[in-house]
């Protein structure tokens, strides 16, 4: 099921048959690090998420600072208002498919994560490293090896789909990539 945003990155209610509506957005560790020694998101800038035909592009560089965790882009799945959990089981959504392209795919990984109402920081994810078409199913994701108390993924309380560029203390990680042709995969 195609998920096509408008020119500001918003997917309108009723624009698809699986009830997904919300905005694309950027995020980074700058909030946690109070704007110092944090990831620099160079695009998009300002409010909204400017795009052409639903091609969501971002660029920047991560930080090597202690406490830095990276940056990324994401999509709200049920933006209310207020934002609510999205029940993937109601709409029989099992994951998402998308095209990854760009001049600089991070040399480490992009984590495609599904945050839930109870689990934002240690959300299950699948790591991807190559351009092309990718299908990431909920059943293929797992929490990171650093998670000491794993939680069970609750498909009835998904809040976001995130494309995170994790930072490294060894060297800054540059990125310049686009997500295009996003679709919800259904049973």
Where are the model-predicted features located?
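Beta-rich carbohydrate-recognition modules and glycan-binding surfaces
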Residues: 1-187
């Amino acid at each position: 099921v195609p998920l096509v945003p408008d020119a500001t990155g918003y997917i309108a209610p009723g624009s698809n048959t699986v009830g997904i509506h919300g905005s694309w957005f950027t995020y980074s560790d700058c909030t946690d690090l109070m704007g110092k020694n944090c990831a620099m998101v160079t695009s998009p800038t300002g409010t909204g998420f400017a795009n052409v035909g639903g091609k969501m592009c971002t660029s920047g560089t991560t930080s090597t600072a202690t406490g830095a965790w990276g940056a990324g882009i994401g999509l709200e799945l049920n933006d209310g208002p207020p934002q609510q959990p999205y029940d993937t089981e109601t709409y029989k959504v099992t994951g998402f498919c998308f095209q990854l392209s760009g001049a600089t795919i991070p040399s480490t990984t992009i984590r495609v994560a599904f945050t839930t109402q109870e689990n934002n920081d240690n959300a299950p994810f699948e790591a991807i490293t190559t351009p092309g078409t990718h299908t990431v199913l909920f059943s293929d994701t797992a929490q990171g090896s650093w998670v000491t108390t794993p939680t069970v993924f609750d498909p009835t309380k998904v809040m976001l789909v995130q494309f995170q560029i994790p930072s490294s203390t060894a060297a800054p990680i540059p990125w310049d990539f686009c997500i295009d042709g996003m679709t919800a995969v259904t049973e």
